[in-house]
Amino acid sequence: MGTRKKVHAFVRVKPTDDFAHEMIRYGDDKRSIDIHLKKDIRRGVVNNQQTDWSFKLDGVLHDASQDLVYETVAKDVVSQALDGYNGTIMCYGQTGAGKTYTMMGATENYKHRGILPRALQQVFRMIEERPTHAITVRVSYLEIYNESLFDLLSTLPYVGPSVTPMTIVENPQGVFIKGLSVHLTSQEEDAFSLLFEGETNRIIASHTMNKNSSRSHCIFTIYLEAHSRTLSEEKYITSKINLVDLAGSERLGKSGSEGQVLKEATYINKSLSFLEQAIIALGDQKRDHIPFRQCKLTHALKDSLGGNCNMVLVTNIYGEAAQLEETLSSLRFASRMKLVTTEPAINEKYDAERMVKNLEKELALLKQELAIHDSLTNRTFVTYDPMDEIQIAEINSQVRRYLEGTLDEIDIISLRQIKEVFNQFRVVLSQQEQEVESTLRRKYTLIDRNDFAAISAIQKAGLVDVDGHLVGEPEGQNFGLGVAPFSTKPGKKAKSKKTFKEPLSSLARKEGASSPVNGKDLDYVSTSKTQLVPSSKDGDVKDMLSRDRETSSIEPLPSDSPKEELRPIRPDTPPSKPVAFEEFKNEQGSEINRIFKENKSILNERRKRASETTQHINAIKREIDVTKEALNFQKSLREKQGKYENKGLMIIDEEEFLLILKLKDLKKQYRSEYQDLRDLRAEIQYCQHLVDQCRHRLLMEFDIWYNESFVIPEDMQMALKPGGSIRPGMVPVNRIVSLGEDDQDKFSQLQQRVLPEGPDSISFYNAKVKIEQKHNYLKTMMGLQQAHRK
């Protein structure tokens, strides 16, 4: 199928002894029905009342048996459902017109069974006729009563009580009822049992038109899923058949319903009105929006109304003259339904598990064909399985030899081998870059050229001038001492005495800690972006330092140990971190502290501007509201006065025109200010990130400075001084501290070695150590935060 087709609409007339032959006539083709009314004499001579109607339908079922109704209406829909097409059969009409009889029939007599039992019977008979397919049948029974959803099969013992109320949910696969139970049936008898169980739970009431009137809409759904038994295809088909028994419409003034029946009739008429609105919208090809969500009935039937299914409508009418108005209303609904078009399509799905199995079989077959092809071309040594570690190592060796020049070419064997060769090229190049970087780190201290704080620090230390050249850099090849540039300024003596680690120790801290090469500030080692500072043990600098020491030894000294006088006396106990932090901000961390304060001031300024802009926006919004009220007042005043031209155009006075212009300007200004506010918020977020980054950097460098200044043992201080054997900043602090550990530290290490003998105590001691470390960390951070607030 796949082409668009119109909905089939049939009319079934309820048998009666008082049939209005003069008013209701059928066409000879049994596809049309004509209605004729006599003019009302009470309306006088001039009477334009319509008296004749003609309706073209797909069939008129008058005095038709249940067998004929099913053969005409439902048999093709059910048959095509087993081929993968969805189907919907709906019964519509006024109260007592025979809708439930058409759908369900009389359960007391087998011959009088309706469309629904016959559809179940046909489904299972067709399943028996298709032994090549494994077809699964599931059913559900939904009731819509007073705009509430109920599961008619919830009373079964194996169906648990619903905790949450049922709701209608949409997904890419369609519309389904969340909370509605779906029951698997393997036999026709089981399906009938479920049908009768649901029928006993339906809400019925006595009515003037029908003793057992259905007071709710009911939807019985049959879900089908067919898999092929013979073919190993992963594709299977699904379908569903919606059998809808609508509640009957009625004229409240005519039926005289009261109490609960009146309330039910109100809900029924309301939902049927929304259904008719949806049908009218579906019949109009120019409509973009279909009001499916106006009521539960139309929402639940969204897939059935105008979807990809075969749809049939059975309109039940009275043949009596007293019910002619309701008959006309039902026939109008049927004619509108015929304008709706659907596009039936097969619902095909794919079984993931079977698809995997088929792909595995196909892969094995392709491997066999490839092996035959390789054997015919004398390539028996080629394998297409995933490579193991030995093969990958061999390819890595080939790539290295190719880069070194000892291998001229790499033989191409397979596509998998080519991909692995490119992968190993990436691995080898990455390893070479890491080796070059580690070599540079061992020989040089790397400083990022974009790290202005580190550059400023080494300029203050006197090692690099403002142009980025090393101080004392040789200008010629014949003399090694060189001449310092004139722009280089010597450090003050007082400052060098106060900070006994200047210049090299502070330089190392700012090079190694403040701008770590393995951090985010230096992602790639490059000579174009990085300043290389030779260490004290390299080449000319080492000679220069040795000559400086020889020169200084000739000069007279005031004492036998001048180095001891230059080094200040270290306090027995280190100062508190808040005090040390203030000293650090004024000296070694002054540059970072300055940047931190600048960023913070910029952040505060942006926040102030954002606050002012917000206040301005609020003021504009208030003015817009006032202008709107004034404009609405002018409009209402103009409408009351009725100022119109001859052509029907409205006349706007000058005051209203000025208000419109003012409102337009205010809205434009509001949008502009709001855009500025969004930009300011983005700047605030960026500035906040910079402030947090500077704060973290300041605290981190202070921690390193504090550890190097007061925690490292004194014997290690001598090694870290200029001219010592170890350059400061190159050895981690925890390794340096461990060199001067006391007996308690040695006992802790001994305890860690002895612990494996008693495994039960490992968790206890490890937890204790972690808690102590956590408390120490929190204590330190609280002290730093208090110092920062000051």
From Swiss-Prot:
Question: Which residues lie in coiled coils?
Answer: 342-380, 658-690
Keywords (A to Z) from UniProt = ATP-binding, Cell projection, Cilium, Coiled coil, Cytoplasm, Cytoskeleton, Flagellum, Microtubule, Motor protein, Nucleotide-binding, Phosphoprotein
Q: What InterPro entries does the record tag this protein with? A: KIF6/9_C (IPR056524), Kinesin-like_fam (IPR027640), Kinesin_motor_CS (IPR019821), Kinesin_motor_dom (IPR001752), Kinesin_motor_dom_sf (IPR036961), P-loop_NTPase (IPR027417)
- Composition skew (Polar residues), residue ranges: 525-534
Stretches of Basic and acidic residues bias are at 537-552, 561-570
- Highest taxon of the lineage: Eukaryota
Where's it found, cell-wise? Cytoplasm, Cytoskeleton; Cell projection, Cilium, Flagellum; Cytoplasm, Cytoskeleton, Flagellum axoneme
- Positions of modified residues (Phosphothreonine): 530
Question: Where is the segment annotated Disordered?
Answer: 477-578
| All copies of domain Kinesin motor, residue ranges | 6-340
Task: List the GO biological process terms.
Answer: extracellular matrix disassembly; microtubule-based movement; organelle disassembly; regulation of flagellated sperm motility; regulation of podosome assembly
Chain positions with Phosphoserine modification: 546
One annotated GO molecular function is: identical protein binding
Q: Name one GO cellular component term.
A: podosome
Q: Which amino acids does the record list as binding ATP?
A: 12-14, 93-100
Q: How does it assemble?
A: Interacts with HYDIN.
Which family is this sequence assigned to? Belongs to the TRAFAC class myosin-kinesin ATPase superfamily. Kinesin family.
Reported function: Essential for normal male fertility and for progressive motility of spermatozoa.
Name of the featured protein: Kinesin-like protein KIF9
Q: What is the lineage of its organism?
A: Eukaryota, Metazoa, Chordata, Craniata, Vertebrata
Encoded by which gene?
Answer: KIF9
